[in-house]
Regions:
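Bacterial N-terminal signal peptides
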Residues: 10-21
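Hydrophobic side chains within alpha-helical segments
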Residues: 14-16, 153-156
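Metalloprotease/metallohydrolase-associated module, dominated by Zn2+-dependent proteases
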Residues: 36-53, 113-137, 141-142, 158-218
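N-terminal secretory signal peptides that target proteins for export/translocation
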Residues: 1-8
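Hydrophobic beta-strand segments of well-ordered beta-sheets in folded domains
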Residues: 29-36, 66, 89-92, 164
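Boundary at the C-terminal end of the N-terminal hydrophobic targeting segment
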Residues: 24-28
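Metzincin-family zinc-dependent endopeptidase catalytic domain
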Residues: 45-154, 160
């Protein structure tokens, strides 16, 4: 899925367009995910770090920590730790320089399987940058909020939208103000669903380790 803004309306708003393809800074939270970041867009190191702080804030408020691994900056490989198939607690986020959808106002895309699960999402930086200029928000916070929304879809699936919060199908002026202030987040129900999923995955890992007598990947 991805965000898009309605060009013909006078209000400042962002809307969410479902584009799910059929085919999450470390904190003190007990539950944690790792997000492998491929920055293939002209996003500076400092702007990316601030965006990661914002996305981590959103997830931390839901009781989930994020460990970021910056795999690529432009054409330069930053970390070799990304050269593996993502485990169950790992997700891959690519910041692409330009959009890859036919609708040029879509801001990103989460790739979901038929069961609503996924590991990969893309953000389209040129469109986010354009929206930032039009809406006069903070580019790092907007980038981080869009990242949190797309990662949220990887947790919550195709039917993840809510009337309020970061997973709302439409971001109107109040939501944009919350983005600018760094207060937009998941609902309580969404937080519980995401934590329950991680707890199930952890339980599977512990069971696997006890049966096999070795750590293994999960």
């Amino acid at each position: 899925m991805g965000f898009h803004w309605k060009k013909m309306l006078p209000e400042l708003e962002l809307a969410v367009l479902l584009c799910g393809s059929i085919a999450a800074a470390a904190s003190g939270d007990n539950l944690q995910i790792t997000v492998l970041v491929y920055n293939n867009a002209p996003v500076s190191v400092s702007a990316l770090k601030q965006a990661e702080v914002e996305a981590a804030r959103v997830f931390s408020a839901a009781g989930i920590g994020i460990a970021w691994v910056n795999c690529m900056q432009g054409s330069r490989t930053v970390s070799e730790a990304c050269a593996h198939v993502p485990r169950s607690d790992e997700f891959v986020l690519q910041i692409a320089p330009t959009g890859k959808t036919s609708n040029d106002s879509v801001f990103g895309e989460a790739f979901l399987a038929e069961d609503g699960r996924g590991k990969y999402c893309d953000l389209f930086f040129d469109r986010i940058e354009d929206a930032n200029l039009r809406f006069r928000t903070n580019i790092s916070r907007l980038l981080g909020a869009v990242a949190a929304h797309e990662l949220g879809h990887l947790f919550l699936g195709l039917n993840a939208h809510s009337k309020v919060g970061i997973m709302a199908p439409v971001w109107e002026q109040q939501s944009l103000r919350e983005v600018a202030m760094g207060t937009l987040g998941f609902t309580g129900v969404q937080s519980k669903l995401m934590k329950a999923r991680l707890e199930r995955e952890q339980a599977k890992f512990i069971s696997f380790r006890s049966r096999n007598g070795r750590p293994g990947d999960y």
